[in-house]
Amino acid sequence: NTPIELTFLFPPIKGLVTSRFGESREHFGVDIVSSEGDRVVSILDGTVIFAEWTIETGYVVHIQHDNHLISVYKHNSKILKRVGTRVLAGDVIALVGNSGEHSTGTHLHFEMWHKGVPLNPENYISFE
């Protein structure tokens, strides 16, 4: 198993990061502004383990990758994969949106978790 630091991760979308990772304020990911309907892609090969609507974060997808890594994609306008689906790095999994009560505009909220610990995605991925 290759360490995360040595693994190429696809950016889920390209765009401007408008809200950065901050554990102190419980923002466990980054917000990336993009256009409604832009394609959201998987950062690595993996299996979809959650693909549902939630009141707070709208249409959400979670993908389990090797090395105990989970990627999370929130506020989508549409989910394109079902739970149990195997995806490859770069596969389109959802479309950017503004769904859920916690959304403040069209963007993707993106998180990375390793063994239950949130990681700062900007340490591993260039979004611009």
Task: Enumerate the predicted regions with their spans.
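Residue-level recognition of beta-strand microenvironments
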Residues: 20, 51-52, 79, 96-99, ...
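Surface-exposed, glycine-biased beta-strand/turn segments
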Residues: 1-57
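Conserved beta-strand positions that form and line the central face of beta-propeller blades
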Residues: 31, 62, 72, 95, ...
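Zn2+-dependent peptidoglycan hydrolase active-site motif and core
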Residues: 43-80, 106-107
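Short, well-structured beta-strand-loop connectors
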Residues: 39-48, 81-96
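Conserved, short, structured surface segments that act as functional micro-motifs
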Residues: 85-128
